[in-house]
Amino acid sequence: MLRLFSSRFYCKIATKSNEKATKLDFKQLTHPTKVPQTPVDSKFPDTSASEIQIDTKTIQLLERLSLVDLDSERALATLKSSIQFADKIAHINTEHVRPLYTVLEHQQLQLRNDQVTEGDCRAEVLRNAKVTDEDYFVSPPGNIPLEQ
């Protein structure tokens, strides 16, 4: 007897009643994907030759805006590697590349109509906050004071 598990039409696994499930072969899917099956590093240009220099004024501004303490060497190394990665992404040639909105671009999504079932409960929601300002929640300050 052959059972067919088909919760989604694009992922089907056939098993016999007394055997284990076979592995799903993505190459046989009815909707092939544009996402590469293996990691691709060659598309990133090599911009690691230039050392990232961050002055103390910029570090202080980032600490103030992000409420993250960047005093340790590990935090600075993480910040520099993040900037280098963003620089790599900024230099990728995306000319003639159509935008990808979803990895399941051939599958139709069933959308429902937007109908408001509950509404006008702003006062009830804001009662949960300790501090509010002009109908907004006020969060507690982080680990760095905002006044400088």
UniProtKB/Swiss-Prot annotation:
One of its GO terms (biological process) is regulation of translational fidelity. It is found in: Mitochondrion. The keyword Mitochondrion applies. InterPro entries: Asp/Glu-ADT_sf_sub_c, GatC. Its EC number is 6.3.5.-. Keywords: ATP-binding, Ligase, Mitochondrion, Nucleotide-binding, Protein biosynthesis. One of its GO terms (cellular component) is glutamyl-tRNA(Gln) amidotransferase complex. Its main location: mitochondrion. It catalyses: L-glutamyl-tRNA(Gln) + L-glutamine + ATP + H2O = L-glutaminyl-tRNA(Gln) + L-glutamate + ADP + phosphate + H(+). Pfam families: GatC. One of its GO terms (molecular function) is glutaminyl-tRNA synthase (glutamine-hydrolyzing) activity. It is an enzyme of class 6 (ligase). HAMAP family: GatC. Subunit of the heterotrimeric GatCAB amidotransferase (AdT) complex, composed of A, B and C subunits. This protein may be expected to contain an N-terminal transit peptide but none has been predicted. Belongs to the GatC family. Allows the formation of correctly charged Gln-tRNA(Gln) through the transamidation of misacylated Glu-tRNA(Gln) in the mitochondria. The reaction takes place in the presence of glutamine and ATP through an activated gamma-phospho-Glu-tRNA(Gln). This is Glutamyl-tRNA(Gln) amidotransferase subunit C, mitochondrial. It comes from Drosophila melanogaster (Fruit fly). The lineage of its organism: Eukaryota, Metazoa, Ecdysozoa, Arthropoda, Hexapoda. The gene is GatC.
